[in-house]
Amino acid sequence: MFKGGMGNIMKQAQQMQERMQKVQDDLANLEVTGEAGAGMVKVTMTCNHNVRRVNIDESLMDDDKDMVEDLVAAAFNDAVRRVQETSKEKMGDVTGGMPLPPGFKMPGF
């Protein structure tokens, strides 16, 4: 009886691992965009943190260099936050909302 139950648990774990791998593959191609300065600076990255684009509104090119740098940093931070939220949401679909320990990171994230 225990043996059959353990086999079932192992099978479920394998299925969950396969679903998690599929979600990770999907996230690698999913793009999110972080913004700062009311959308004047945008950073687009995949959910595995590869930056695809950085867009800076032309009107900022004549502004203070420090301000533009701050806006770029804020847009990057916003993009990273959005990646984390999207990844958590997609992984939650796989884990069925199973609570994970605080600070627990899924492999590949």
Curated annotation (Swiss-Prot):
Species? Alteromonas mediterranea (strain DSM 17117 / CIP 110805 / LMG 28347 / Deep ecotype)
| Keywords carried by this UniProt record | Cytoplasm, DNA-binding
How the protein assembles, per its UniProt entry?
Homodimer.
Bias-annotated ranges (Pro residues): 99-109
Q: Which family does it belong to?
A: Belongs to the YbaB/EbfC family.
Q: What does this protein do?
A: Binds to DNA and alters its conformation. May be involved in regulation of gene expression, nucleoid organization and DNA protection.
Q: Where in the cell is it found?
A: Cytoplasm, Nucleoid
This protein's name: Nucleoid-associated protein MADE_1013280
GO cellular component terms, alphabetically, are: bacterial nucleoid; cytosol
UniProt-recorded Gene Ontology molecular function terms: DNA binding
Q: Name the domain of life this protein comes from.
A: Bacteria
Q: Does the keyword Cytoplasm apply?
A: yes
What is the predominant subcellular site recorded for this chain? cytoplasm
Give me the ranges of the annotated region Disordered: 86-109
Annotated SUPFAM superfamilies? YbaB-like
